Amino acid sequence: MATPITTIKKETKTAEQIKLEKIEELKELLAENEDAVSKTMTLMNELNDLGIFDAATSMLRAKEDIAKIALGQVSREPVTNLINTMMAAGGALTKADPEFTAKLLESVMAGTEQAQSFLKEDKKVGILDLLKAMNDPDINRAVGFGLQFLKGMGKELREQ
């Protein structure tokens, strides 16, 4: 009959054995991914030749100075005004009807094209031309829209 097991010996590896195993695993990975490793090394050489690594290292060393400069630039009044204006415009745009806004922008583009062709003709517009133009349904619609736009804008300005 066999003797009972009373102790279990755990095999412990030395630091040297662990290093050798890791080196073997790394060799296997390199062999399995030879093409990817080759391309990566080529890319690294190109980046090094361009000085990207030197620039990145310099930037990392000067990160506090760069952060101070960037913060100084961002906190300038024109920049904060721009940020506040963009936030207000974004808030106003969220209230706008997307379909109407698209239609309005298409109308503006069509009007711009028509106006450019008029500028090429170099014609003068007289008072009678303006009065006749009011009979054109497209012009009348745009003028009416503009007048109502101005009225609504004026009301809002008065309330503030």
Swiss-Prot record:
InterPro entries linked to this entry: DUF1641 (IPR012440)
Q: List, alphabetically, the Pfam families matched.
A: DUF1641
Family per UniProt?
Answer: To A.fulgidus AF1717.
Question: Know the name of this protein?
Answer: Uncharacterized protein YrhD
* Organism, as annotated: Bacillus subtilis (strain 168)
